[in-house]
């Protein structure tokens, strides 16, 4: 089973769009889109990972 991952190399970004494409983080929090998720990954110093695509 392959791990689900997202390329966050272009982040952090100062502003994210309102586009809703949810991702579920390893903290069991639903992030609205890749931008919001990747900004949180950067803030967590890489400890936050992706559980799955879609809501938690």
Swiss-Prot record:
Alphabetically ordered keywords of this record: Disulfide bond, Glycoprotein, Protease inhibitor, Repeat, Secreted, Serine protease inhibitor
Glycan-linked positions: 45
Site feature (Reactive bond 3) residues: 18-19
SMART domains: KAZAL
Description of its domains: Avian ovomucoid consists of three homologous, tandem Kazal family inhibitory domains.
Primary location group: secreted
Keyword check for Repeat: yes
Gene3D superfamilies: 3.30.60.30
Record protein name field: Ovomucoid
Subcellular location: Secreted
An annotated Gene Ontology molecular function: serine-type endopeptidase inhibitor activity
PROSITE patterns linked to this entry: KAZAL_1, KAZAL_2
Disulfides per UniProt: 8-38, 16-35, 24-56
Pfam families listed in its UniProt record: Kazal_1
Organism: Phasianus colchicus colchicus (Black-necked pheasant)
A single cellular component GO annotation: extracellular space
């Amino acid at each position: 089973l392959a791990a689900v991952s997202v390329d966050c190399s272009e982040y952090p970004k100062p502003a994210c769009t309102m586009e809703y494409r949810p991702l579920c983080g390893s903290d069991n929090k639903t992030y609205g889109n890749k931008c919001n998720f990747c900004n949180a990954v950067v803030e967590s110093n890489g400890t936050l990972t992706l559980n799955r695509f879609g809501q938690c």
